[in-house]
Amino acid sequence: VGGNLCTFNLLQGTEYMPDVKNKILFLEDDGESGKVFNRNFDRDLQSLLHLCKGKNIKAIIFGRAQKNCEMTEEKWIEIIKNKKELENIPIVINADFGHTTPICTIPIGGYAKIKFDENIDIEITK
């Protein structure tokens, strides 16, 4: 399950909010907030984690932020480490999907497998 994090927040409390339990989440953002992107992304992510209590999420893959957002690897790590709900969830950052180039299309509702070792392998299985 995945998509734009701001849109997920707009769906919270509606019948259209997808069930995130036992799912791999693919999350990205459009970067319209520019230099305050990391603060807004942090807040939007926390809102989503409060909704699902961070339980039973299999993994989260974050799409790479646009350059104007000035989102560094250090900022990603800081946001992730400050979320106790994410402590035991595998996380991938800077994946090539979302509002950036190059872009990978990810089928929503499909099945995927993630392997974490020397490399991170993401395989769409169905």
Where are these regions (language model features)?
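Structural motif
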Residues: K23-L25, K58-I61, I89-V92
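Glycine-rich anion-binding loop/nest that anchors nucleotide
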Residues: F26-D30, I61-Q66
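Short amphipathic alpha-helix initiation/capping segments at coil-to-helix junctions
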Residues: F37, H50, C69-E73
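ATP/nucleoside-binding phosphotransfer catalytic cores, i.e., glycine-rich phosphate-binding loops
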Residues: R64-K126
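Solvent-exposed alpha-helices and their adjacent loops that cap or buttress functional pockets
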Residues: M17-D19, K53, K84, T105-I106
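ATP/pyrophosphate-binding catalytic subdomain of soluble kinases
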Residues: V1-Q46
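Short amphipathic alpha-helical segments
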Residues: R43, K55, K75-I79
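Phosphate/pyrophosphate-binding loops at sites that engage ATP/ADP/AMP, CoA/4′-phosphopantetheine
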Residues: L48-K58
